[in-house]
């Protein structure tokens, strides 16, 4: 199966298939996007209502805590599409994987420059059972 980090895996082997950064996504008219910045800092981001998928909550909070910055998690969604939809409707700024920007033309994205918020897509299988399909895929990957 394919999974996205961060995730706890016990009894599984994994292979990284892709990496991508988490980006700030908001409407072009949102105040955070009006700044003359192509990239943002965590401190700048902390001034706004943050929307995210529950999967990234601890990961993002840890990044803020390491810098000694408080942030406002305005809405924690069950999935990334819901978080994107809320940002599209102007309810805050979403922090989501870069690939999510392909799903909409309504938001623009900015990179967070002072922290590496990267997620991976993993191929995972149980240690004791490696399906033939996975073996074939791993042979060519």
Give names to the regions the model predicted.
Residues 1-47, 98-107, 117:
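Acidic, Gly/Pro-rich loop/turn segments at junctions of secondary structure
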Residues 46-49, 71, 119-122:
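Short amphipathic alpha-helical segments
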Residues 23, 49-51, 92-94:
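Hydrophobic acceptor-binding patch used for acceptor engagement in glycosyltransferases
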């Amino acid at each position: 199966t394919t999974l996205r980090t961060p995730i706890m895996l016990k009894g599984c082997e994994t292979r990284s298939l892709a990496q991508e950064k988490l980006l700030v996504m908001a409407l072009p008219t949102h105040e955070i996007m009006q700044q003359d910045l192509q990239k943002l800092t965590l401190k700048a981001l902390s001034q706004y209502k943050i929307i995210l998928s529950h999967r990234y909550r601890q990961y993002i909070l840890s990044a803020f805590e390491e810098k000694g910055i408080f942030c406002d998690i305005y809405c924690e969604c069950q999935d990334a599409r819901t978080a994107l939809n809320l940002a599209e409707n102007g309810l805050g700024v979403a922090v989501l994987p870069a690939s999510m920007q392909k799903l909409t033309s309504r938001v623009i994205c900015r990179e967070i420059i002072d922290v590496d918020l990267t997620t991976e897509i993993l191929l995972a299988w149980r240690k004791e059972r490696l399906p033939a399909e996975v073996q074939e895929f791993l042979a060519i990957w």
